[in-house]
Every structure is written in C-alpha cells, then in structure tokens.
Amino acid sequence: MSGSSLRIVVPALLVIVGSVPVSLPAHAADGTIVVQRQVQPRVAYRPSMVPDPHPTVVDTNVSAEVNALANGAASGNTVSRELGDADFAIVTSGSGIRSMILTGSALPGFASQPANPATVQAVGNLGTTHGAGGGAGAGLAGQINGSLKQGLAPLQMLGGGQ
C-alpha cells in the first residue's frame, strides 16, 4: 500500500473500531457514601495536596448484619427462619379497641348525660352540669369556649367589643 492509501485506511479503520459498542460488565461498588470530607484550599493550577485521610463515611452495605441476624449470631438473637403465617396471625389491627372506646355509639366523656356519677366525679369538673348545659360534653365545651373567649379578649377590645 502506498502512503496516501494508508492515510485514508487507518482513520477509517479507527472510526469503524471506535463505533463498535464494547459492553464490559458493570460492577457495583461497595456502597460506601462519603458524608463529609475536609477539602483543603489550593491554588487552581496546582495539584491538590493530600486528600483527607479520615473522611466521614457511611457504609450502606448491610449484608454482614443481615447475615448475622439470619444466622442468629447478632446479640444473642435466634432468628434463623422466615416469618410464617402464624407470625402474622398474632398481629392485630386495633379493631378490638373500638368496642372499648365507643360505648353506646358515643365517645366517653361526650355523652349528654353521664352514665356513672362515680366515674364523672373521678374525672373532675368535666361531668358536672352547668345550668341547662348537660353532662360531660357540655362541661368540656364550656371550658373550651371560655378559654377561647379569654384568649380572644384582647382582639375584642381592639375591635371595640364587637
């Protein structure tokens, strides 16, 4: 081949070889995340000084902890199996508490008439009737309304008592 044909063939060959996709296997790193690192000041055109020898890092690779738990070696645990149906069967949704909270389709303390005077007395002033107000609900509502009126009194004074 002559020199002029080599000048044409070699770049064409490089373009062909460069355009062929090369698929190398991608490997994940160990999962270390650098949270904080001391960055040393330097002049822009000089190479950096020594990097921080002790950066604050977080290792997200938890395989050692997971394997230790699965084998029962971490802190005396005996977890060496997967969770089964029996493990999930003992979990409750809290629906049983509904019967304890709702007594006669009303929330305790908000009934119009207190069911048990001893219970009302144990609660305190909430159950005492105030005029025609009713039971514990009216007492609680009266306390809330009184607190709101007291808190809004400065604004009412600014508005001329309206």
Swiss-Prot record:
Described function: An intrinsically disordered chaperone for fibril amyloid FapC that guards against fibrillation within the periplasm. Upon overexpression of the endogenous six-gene locus (fapA-fapF), cells form large clumps during liquid growth, make large amounts of biofilm and produce amyloid fibrils.
Segments crossing the lipid bilayer: none
Subcellular location: Periplasm
Stretches of the chain forming a coiled coil according to its record: none
GO biological process: amyloid fibril formation
UniProt subunit comment: Monomer in solution. Interacts with FapC but not FapB in vitro.
Name listed for the protein in its UniProt record: Functional amyloid chaperone FapA
UniProt GO cellular component terms: periplasmic space
First and last residue of the signal peptide: 1-28
Keywords associated with the record: Chaperone, Periplasm, Signal
Gene knockout outcome: Both a single fapA deletion and deletion of the entire fapA-fapF six-gene locus show no visible growth phenotype and no change in biofilm formation.
Family: Belongs to the FapA family.
Expression induction: Constitutively transcribed with a peak during mid-exponential phase; maximum transcripts are seen under 37 degrees Celsius and at 200-500 mM NaCl. The first gene in the probable fapA-fapF operon.
Domain of life of the organism encoding this protein: Bacteria
